[in-house]
């Protein structure tokens, strides 16, 4: 039997049985939910509604990093031979943030055959002056990230890969979370969010990684924090940034050394990356 026809018959049988057991209103409600998930993907579960993003943009309209009331977060991103498609998607995700409290620090170690990386970044710099860039010698992921940190002017730092995407409300949400921690008298040195994996479009993630609140034993076993992690630049400076001898697990090593100073990390339960 055709797989789709078999599936359709199974769904029809389920609908009939559900109507008998729980009534027509319940069946219609569950059916509507099924259609929404099938036709519109998982976006509603991972990203805020359009009106929420519009409200954030309206709140921040006409404001700069200096007067928006949110802590400035400098995003550290080493570039290396980044494909144009991924680079543009990443830069677009920064330019289109709902709040202006982000700074994007790019350290480009691309080889001579990928000079277009610099050209593309310079194109985006004309759109957004909060993108800073420098060309560097390739010394590995940790050293290249440290080079990006030398460009940072923010009170906080974040790590982002050159072929990933920030959720449109990432900087706004992290900035608000920091302010909330301060208002509650809680430590604000280290925060992390949930994240989603996707292939072709951020609108249709394949799976989300919903993380637990700070779990020290789990962190010792694996880097469950990953992205998006935000931490005070003063802490980064104190521990000396990332260690080149830990290339390949440099972020995990960094986070373990950070929590030695902060005694934990605050979980922001939203998909921001």
Across the structure, where does each feature detected by a protein language model lie?
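Short beta-strand/loop segment that forms part of the nucleotide-sugar
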Residues: 101-112, 132-137
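Short aromatic/hydrophobic "clamp" motif used to bind/position activated sugar donors
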Residues: 157
């Amino acid at each position: 039997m055709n797989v789709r026809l078999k599936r359709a018959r199974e769904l029809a049988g389920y609908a009939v049985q559900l109507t008998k057991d729980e009534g027509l209103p319940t069946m219609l409600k569950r059916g509507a939910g099924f259609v929404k998930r099938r036709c519109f993907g998982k976006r509603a579960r991972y990203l805020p509604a359009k009106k929420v993003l519009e409200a954030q943009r309206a709140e921040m309209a006409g404001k700069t990093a200096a007067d928006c009331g949110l802590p400035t977060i400098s995003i550290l991103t080493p570039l290396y031979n980044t494909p144009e498609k991924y680079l543009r998607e990443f830069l677009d995700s920064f330019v289109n943030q709902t709040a202006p409290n982000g700074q994007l620090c790019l350290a480009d170690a691309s080889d001579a055959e990928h000079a277009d990386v610099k050209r593309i970044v310079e194109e985006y710099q004309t759109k957004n002056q909060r993108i800073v860039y420098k060309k560097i010698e390739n010394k590995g992921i940790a050293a290249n990230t440290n080079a990006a940190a030398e460009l940072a002017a923010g009170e906080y730092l974040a790590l982002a890969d050159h072929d990933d995407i920030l959720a449109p409300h990432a900087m706004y949400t992290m900035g608000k979370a920091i302010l909330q921690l301060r208002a509650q008298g809680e430590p604000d040195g280290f925060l992390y969010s949930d994240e989603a994996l996707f292939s072709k479009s951020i609108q249709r993630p394949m799976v989300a990684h919903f993380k637990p609140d700070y779990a020290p034993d789990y962190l010792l076993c694996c880097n469950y924090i990953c992205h998006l992690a935000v931490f005070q630049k003063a802490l980064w400076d104190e521990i000396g940034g990332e260690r080149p001898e830990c290339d390949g697990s440099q972020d995990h090593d960094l986070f373990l050394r950070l929590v030695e100073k902060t005694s934990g990390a605050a979980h922001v339960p939203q998909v921001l990356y």
